[in-house]
Design a protein with these regions (language model features):
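An aromatic- and glycine-enriched ligand-binding surface/loop that stacks and positions planar moieties
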Residues: 43, 50-52, 68-171
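Aromatic-anchored glycine-rich loop motif in surface-exposed flexible loops
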Residues: 1-67, 85-87
């Protein structure tokens, strides 16, 4: 639950800044009285949730459960969120802890990284399963990924020009 809460609030804070922050169930009347919590108060709580999640999660799962959140996923997503927040030392520390687990490494051939045969490579830290056969597809991720990052922009489905320019164009 801590991993999920941290991940959801990290996304909300990244997109919107100050948001309503609750850690317990509220009834509808109370919900209408809640105001936004400053981003500066929420960010440390997100880091704390990722830390507690990392303490309680296993380093890895096997079989069907292999796509569940792990210690490495909590550390990696904490590092990613810290980068977005400009907290370089927190990001570096979380990334180092993830790397020190010794479970992940870069895939040897970048060209084959995104093939079906290499979909669960050692480079993958946290995966969202997708399978037409088992009817596990994008679902509502389409909506979430189309939330604008900035006015007039698209979410994760449309790369920025900077990302495009980071790749060598050979055609």
């Amino acid at each position: 639950a801590l991993f999920q809460r941290a991940s959801c609030y990290a996304r909300l804070v990244t997109y919107f800044g100050d948001v309503v922050y609750v850690t317990s169930v509220v009834d509808i009347e109370e919900a209408f009285t809640l105001g936004r919590t400053p981003k500066s108060e929420i960010v440390p709580k997100i880091y704390e949730d990722y830390d507690k999640a990392a303490e309680g999660l296993p380093e890895k799962y096997t079989g069907v459960s292999s796509l569940r959140a792990t210690k490495g996923a909590a550390l990696a997503l904490k590092a990613r969120f810290a980068l977005y927040m400009g907290d370089w030392e927190i990001a570096a520390d979380a990334a180092k802890k993830c790397m020190d687990l010794g479970l992940y490494k870069l895939h040897a051939d970048y060209a084959e990284l995104f093939l079906m045969t290499t979909k669960n490579s050692e480079e993958s830290i946290f995966l969202l399963p997708r399978s037409i056969e088992y009817k596990v597809t994008l679902g509502n991720w389409t909506v979430m990924n189309e939330v604008s990052r900035n006015p007039g922009g698209w979410g994760a489905f449309a790369p920025s020009w900077d990302l495009l320019a980071a790749y060598e164009c050979t055609d």
